[in-house]
């Protein structure tokens, strides 16, 4: 067996039995999901605006739930589209922790999460409303991290084939596991961050 195959097999075992922390601050609320021992630990703070205080919230959350950052295999960061300033603050905090603790950091985006929550696959496009603008992507392209999306001030009149979201639906580590199992994440060395236009 060659080294590349062994590396992929090892990563897939790590992803399936993973312990990770997902951080989402793209749409004005803070969502933390920690998966450990097949259990989800979740914190949701609606209308969270103080990203400078994020590190204290993260550490308190781990302490209150008897979790240990050292046990994580990786962090997963939602890169948008959405707010940029808070995301930048949180991303720098996580990358610092990851550097010190030798923990991997992966990125994903809102379109990947949205696709995992859409039950009716009869839709052709998905639209995410952020600050009175619609970020629109073909549903078939949502798995492709780098595929393009369009930004519009309003939806098309004939938008019955577009599923619209004004916020992310509730999601769990199972939605994130889909991204991991299909290797749809992006490595932190290549992070594009979707900025509000």
Language model features by range: what are they?
Residues 38-139:
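Nucleotide and nucleotide-moiety/phosphate-recognizing core
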């Amino acid at each position: 067996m060659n080294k590349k195959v062994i590396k992929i097999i090892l990563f897939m075992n790590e992803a399936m039995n993973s312990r990770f922390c997902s951080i989402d601050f793209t749409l004005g609320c803070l969502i933390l999901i920690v998966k450990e021992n097949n259990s989800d630990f979740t914190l949701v703070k609606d209308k969270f605006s103080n990203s400078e205080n994020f590190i204290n919230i993260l550490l308190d959350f781990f302490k209150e739930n008897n979790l240990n950052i050292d046990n994580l295999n990786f962090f997963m960061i939602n890169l948008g589209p959405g707010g940029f300033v808070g995301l930048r603050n949180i991303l720098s905090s996580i990358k610092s922790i990851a550097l010190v603790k030798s923990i991997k950091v992966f990125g994903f985006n809102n379109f990947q999460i949205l696709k995992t929550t859409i039950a009716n696959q009869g839709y052709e496009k998905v639209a995410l409303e952020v600050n009175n603008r619609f970020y629109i992507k073909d549903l078939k392209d949502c798995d492709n991290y780098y595929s393009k999306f369009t930004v519009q001030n309003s939806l098309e009149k004939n938008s019955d084939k577009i599923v619209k979201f004004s916020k992310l639906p509730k999601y769990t580590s199972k939605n994130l596991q889909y991204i991991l199992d299909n290797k749809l994440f992006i490595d932190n060395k290549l992070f594009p961050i979707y900025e509000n236009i």
